[in-house]
Regions:
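Conserved pre-motif I regulatory segment
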Residues: 1-32
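Walker A/P-loop
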Residues: 27-47
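Conserved Walker A/P-loop ATP-binding site and its immediately adjacent core
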Residues: 42-75, 163-168, 330-333
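Conserved P-loop NTPase motor "coupling/switch" region that bridges the ATPase
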Residues: 125, 142-245, 425
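Conserved helicase/translocase motor-coupling segment
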Residues: 242-348
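Conserved helicase ATPase core of P-loop NTP-dependent helicases/translocases
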Residues: 324-328, 337, 343-380
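Conserved RecA-like helicase motor core of SF1/SF2 enzymes
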Residues: 381-414, 418, 422
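A conserved SF2-helicase RecA2
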Residues: 407-477
């Protein structure tokens, strides 16, 4: 198959690449590219990387993003480089184990490898795409990625959702902390200590003891402070733009869409709701406790299955009006049944999910992008492009239906960017069962998504708001 047309960078992508290069010229150890999902961060990054003198580059990214990186590099028309593409799950292969080990279990050896191992080789340029994945400094992937970044001359961090709370940004310590902690190759402990000192100096949160015990109460003053440090201050370490700030870029259009329940589905839903209320009461009345959270998850999964027919009917209408439809779901069983239901209606449908190989998922994605599928049902939240006009045959209007509401602003923002991206508009429909607690949850989510700035605390605030809605409804009905 012949390659797609040559990629032409847009002005905002050139601006991003110039900001990255300016940080490099200023001697900074890295840069945070925080543009919202759909603004083409991959091409922005590659424009900058291709202009740097180093030939060898390590790109660490989600497995599903590897095809996009390959496509961007192939179609950008820029000088070739020696690029190693590595997904997060394979990063341990980058490390050599310590000379002596007494660990016996696989888990213990892997932890030791990530913490005490040394890089088998060093790349001068490192990219960490979807960098929020390494926000836990004690995770195996986080430890390895931070070591590779520490050994590099320059590291580019890419994430539209850098962290839910300020202390989750410790992976950016070398960029944020002045002085010795920014020196190439220093220990990771110095990074965390330096970041801890920064948080204490700024009076943000409680940074005492082990990282997992750090805490923070969302507030606007801290959000403004972090925004200043990350993106808006004169010495900001990164760049972040929203789609509506880009000239000619379509704004996100969100709609809440009620789906009807027939008599039997209504009976099942109400029985499921009663069972949830009973379990929640036994759990102390809060979804923020482990038992309450588990009860909430069971309720959402059962509700997801009950609503399949309504979502299929809604997708019927969209496809019948000449559109292609991407449907986001949270559960594999829902995915399989939705595909079966829509195929039964005569549509060409397939799925993208974590049970399939990367090659299979990419084949489904390409079929959708070429217009060979009417709908695709997907469980992933990041690293795939399902927007209109990427390939010949994919010119139909697109709609995104969120069948399963996530209780995370970060996940929802990532999901929204699967279709509404690269300057292509896609209406985003949040589906819910009418006359149920889901109606108020959907309204709460839409309101908060419209106002969110993607900075620290958005995800926590949304989770608390949704929990409040559910708990209030459980007590009242």
């Amino acid at each position: 198959m012949s390659p797609a047309p040559h990629l032409v960078p847009r002005p905002h992508q050139i601006e991003a690449s110039e900001a990255i290069l300016a940080a490099r010229r200023a001697g900074r150890p890295g840069f945070l590219l925080g543009d919202l999902t759909g603004l083409g961060k991959t091409l922005s990054a590659w424009l900058a990387l291709s202009a740097m003198p180093e030939e060898e580059i390590l790109v660490i990214c989600p497995k599903g993003a590897i095809p996009q990186w390959r496509l961007t590099m192939a179609q950008a028309g820029l000088p070739a480089k020696s690029v190693t593409l590595m997904n997060f799950e394979r990063t341990k292969t980058l490390m050599a184990p310590p000379a002596v080990s007494t660990k016996r279990s696989t888990r213990a050896r892997n932890n030791e490898l990530a913490k005490l191992g040394t890089p088998k080789r060093v790349w001068p340029l490192v990219v960490i795409d979807e960098a929020h994945r390494i926000r836990n400094p004690n995770s195996q992937q986080g430890l390895v990625c931070r070591q590779m970044a520490a050994a590099a001359d320059f590291t580019l961090y890419m994430s539209a959702t850098a962290g839910q709370a300020p202390h989750e940004l410790s992976y950016l310590a070398r960029l944020l902390v002045q002085g010795g902690d920014r020196r190439k190759g220093e220990g990771l402990g110095a990074d965390l200590d330096g970041f801890r000192a920064l948080m204490k100096r700024l009076g943000i949160g409680r940074a005492k003891g082990r990282w997992k015990n750090w805490s923070w109460e969302p507030n606007e003053d801290d959000r403004r402070t972090m925004s200043f440090l990350l993106y808006k201050g004169p010495n900001a370490i990164g760049l972040r733009r929203r789609p509506e700030e880009i000239a000619g870029w379509p704004e996100v259009q969100r709609e809440i869409t009620p789906t009807a329940l027939d008599a039997e589905s209504r009976r099942l839903y109400e029985a499921t709701w009663r069972e949830f209320r009973r379990e929640l009461g036994l759990a102390g009345g809060s979804t923020r406790r482990a038992a309450g959270w588990a009860a909430d998850l069971r309720f959402r999964q059962k509700g997801s299955l009950i609503r399949i027919a309504g979502t299929a009917d809604f997708a019927d209408d969209l496809i019948g009006n000449g559109q292609q439809v991407a449907i986001s779901v949270a559960f594999l069983e829902t995915s399989a049944l939705l595909v079966e239901k829509l195929r039964g209606h005569g549509w060409r449908v397939d799925a993208i999910n974590g049970t399939q190989s990367g090659e299979r998922n990419e084949a489904v994605r390409l079929a959708f992008q070429r217009g060979e599928l009417d709908a695709v049902v997907f469980t992933v939240t990041e690293a795939i492009s399902l927007h209109r006009g990427e390939m010949p045959g994919g010119e139909r209007e697109r709609s995104l239906v969120v069948h399963d509401m996530r209780h995370s602003a970060i996940q929802l923002q990532q999901i929204e960017g699967r279709c509404h991206r690269d300057g292509q508009r896609a209406v985003i429909y949040y589906a819910y069962a009418e006359n149920t607690v889901e109606e108020k949850i959907a309204a709460t989510v839409i309101g908060r998504m419209a106002d969110m700035d993607g900075m620290a605390g958005d995800d926590t605030a949304m989770l608390d708001a949704i929990a409040g809605v559910i708990e209030e409804a459980a007590e009242a009905r």
